[in-house]
Amino acid sequence: IPIGGYNKLIEGLFEEIETKTDVDFFQSEYKDWQKIADRLVFTGAIDEYFDFCFGKLDWRTVSFKTRIENSPNYQGNAVVNYTSHEKPYTRVIEHKHFEMFGQDIYECPKTVVSEEYSTEYKPGMEPYYPVNDDRNNLLVERYRELAHQEGIIFPEELTYMSKEAEWKGASVLFGGRLAEYKYYDMAQIIEKVLPLWRTDDSLLHINFSVWERIYAYFIRLNRFFVLSLHL
């Protein structure tokens, strides 16, 4: 957990970056996005981008039940995972332990606790986890091949490109859980992405520290996130 929480982190990521909310990428023509940006970083669902032409990918989602306990210390840790069928939830989160330690915990006589439940994804829900089985693995490969046919690139492919001219024609980059159909935690995505831009920070003629902030936001996605830049 970042110092000060995720709100502070997100505010820092978007500092000096124009941000618009309540904008549906799919309600606008692609040419409209091209008018305001040379390239798009797209973190929406890869199958939705192509209008589900090969079929829909499967997801798992989660729901939370949050309550206040009249106790300064409910479970002694921020997160306790449960794998037994005896429990309907997969983990219990006690939020104060993320930033409070030692005797500080007992200064507040109450504590906030959340139970996390894993459920099957249905339309209208927020997709959280890709389903790693034969059907979905084969299906996402078809979408990735289609993306390549349209000149779309993925973050791992940039590792092997040391000159901007080698991918100068690319105008869309897919990244994140939904666009890559891969599970990522915060630490994993930062570890994966930062070296890509340190190898050659002139790839996009943009300071790589800006890309660090951009890709650090590739983690917990809402429906999707689209970043538009003039380069």
Task: Put a short name on every predicted segment.
Residues 1-39:
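Helical element adjacent to the flavin cofactor pocket in flavoenzyme catalytic cores
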Residues 20-24, 95, 175:
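Conserved beta-strand termini and adjacent loop/short-helix elements that scaffold enzyme active sites
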Residues 26-146, 151-152, 159-162, 167:
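Mid-domain catalytic core of redox enzymes
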Residues 129-211:
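C-terminal catalytic lobe of FAD-dependent flavoproteins
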Residues 2-6, 33, 81-82, 182-189:
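Aromatic-acidic/polar surface patches that form glycan- and anion
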